């Protein structure tokens, strides 16, 4: 459960990300594909080269989902309900991959905003990303 301080910290980080969300989404995916190559199996039709149009497009979707979750931080489940259905019923993505994606997003934020990622903010952002992952896998059962 995200505390009031967690919510403030997460919103603060996303305000710093601002117009870079799409870029960070693509960078997160690229990092995940390199660090966790097994995740590539869900994207057999993608050009997985650095800067590919497909990675940029999917990175934009990832970023949009995270921004949507931040904008509805008190109802992440409601905000991401359709996306949860898609991942559980159609895409059937292994739930561990959301943890991988979250970790890679944390790394991207740390690279671009090192001073913003204090231990407290890091913990809040990690809790938020875990909450998003939990929502996206809730309908698997």
UniProtKB/Swiss-Prot annotation:
One of its GO terms (biological process) is hydrogen peroxide catabolic process. Pfam families: Globin. Disulfide bonds: none annotated. O2 binds at residue 58. Red blood cells. Heme b binds at residue 87. Keywords: Heme, Iron, Metal-binding, Oxygen transport, Transport. GO terms for cellular component: blood microparticle; haptoglobin-hemoglobin complex; hemoglobin complex. One of its GO terms (molecular function) is oxygen binding. PROSITE patterns: GLOBIN. Coiled coil: none annotated. Residues 1-141 form the Globin domain. Heterotetramer of two alpha chains and two beta chains. Involved in oxygen transport from the lung to the various peripheral tissues. Belongs to the globin family. This is Hemoglobin subunit alpha-A. It comes from Branta canadensis (Canada goose). The gene is HBAA.
């Amino acid at each position: 459960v995200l505390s009031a301080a967690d919510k403030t910290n997460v919103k603060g980080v996303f305000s710093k990300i601002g117009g870079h969300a799409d870029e960070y989404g693509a960078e997160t995916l690229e990092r995940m594909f390199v660090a966790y190559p097994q995740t590539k199996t869900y994207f057999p039709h993608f050009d997985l080269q650095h800067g590919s149009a497909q990675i940029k497009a999917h990175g934009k979707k990832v970023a949009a989902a995270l921004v949507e979750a931040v904008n509805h931080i008190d109802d992440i489940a409601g905000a991401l309900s359709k996306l949860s259905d898609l991942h559980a019923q159609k895409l059937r993505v292994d739930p561990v991959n959301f943890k991988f994606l979250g970790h890679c997003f944390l790394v991207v934020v740390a690279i671009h905003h090192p001073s913003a990622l204090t231990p407290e903010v890091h913990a809040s952002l990690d809790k938020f990303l875990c909450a998003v992952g939990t929502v996206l896998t809730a309908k698997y059962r």
